[in-house]
Amino acid sequence: MTTYNVAISLGKNVSPLTRAQLATNYTAKASSNEGLASSQGNKEFDNPSLLISNVGKSYQLHETSLNVLNGINLEIKPGEFLSIVGASGCGKSTLLRLIAGLDTSYSGSIDYQGKPITGTDLSRGIVFQEHRLFPWLTVEENIALAFSATNIAKEERKLRVEKQISIVGLNGFEKAYPHQISGGMSQRVAIARALVLKPKLLLLDEPFGALDALTRLKLQQELQRLWEHEGLTTILVTHDVEEAVFLADRIVVMESHPGRIKRIVPVPLARPRDRSSALFQRIKADVMADFAMVEVE
């Protein structure tokens, strides 16, 4: 079971809201501030970039069928930032692997840009919790490794690697090896490696989970900047509710046994977001109430 060690302080002037009031406030806020949750470069929200229809996934455990996902239905618009939260074992990472095409054994359908996902594709990039850098390769070599299955010209590869190193703020560390840089910098290399192929969909599986709190906050801000800069459709799997509220346009709350969507919470907050604002804290408290960590009276 996942525990969220976060103190919730709504301030003296903020009265507690019921779930119904919270939902009403979210809807009203979204209506009066339409477009605030998207960046200036992400305005094409008409057609779905990703359509997940009645997806189910089971594993065979000895002679028993283990139902991991059941009845997953989700529509994600181009340029949207979606966060998925839920307790360990609810199938968050499994769902991300299906979207990435790393696992094609499931029921239902997953369509990306109007076509069924039948395997991995360079238009979909993924970043895992572990940076998975090769210790014998430098920063630039680790990023350039993404081109190994492409026929992109050598000069174009070099230009793209240089650009991504600059975008993630690693100038001066091109020749450094993984053991010579911090964990946060290593994760930036992993993100740059995912972005260097210019994907349209970025999948993030707990990318900051192993980092210290301060580095995590810094990289959350960095990820927000990259999302706005690149205009990517982004799906983030996380256990950190505050991280989800800080980054996402919508939060998918999942429950377990089998993994399914409990509800979807909109986050109608302008960017950059103020973590101390009353509405930010109310949304966070409401989502955390799903995990019995905070009571919303």
Residue ranges and their predicted role:
Residues 65, 120, 140, 166, ...:
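Signature (C-motif/LSGGQ) region and adjacent switch/coupling loops
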Residues 137-144:
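Short coil-to-helix segment of the ABC ATPase nucleotide-binding domain corresponding to the Q-loop/switch region
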Residues 85-87:
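The feature captures the beta-strand-to-loop junction immediately N-terminal to the Walker
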Residues 176-179, 197:
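Conserved signature/switch motifs of ABC ATPase nucleotide-binding domains
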Residues 127, 191:
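Hydrophobic anchor residue at the start of the ABC signature
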Residues 100:
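Helix-to-loop junction immediately C-terminal to a conserved catalytic motif
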Residues 144, 153-173, 225:
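Conserved ABC ATPase "signature" region
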Residues 108-120:
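Conserved ABC transporter NBD signature motif
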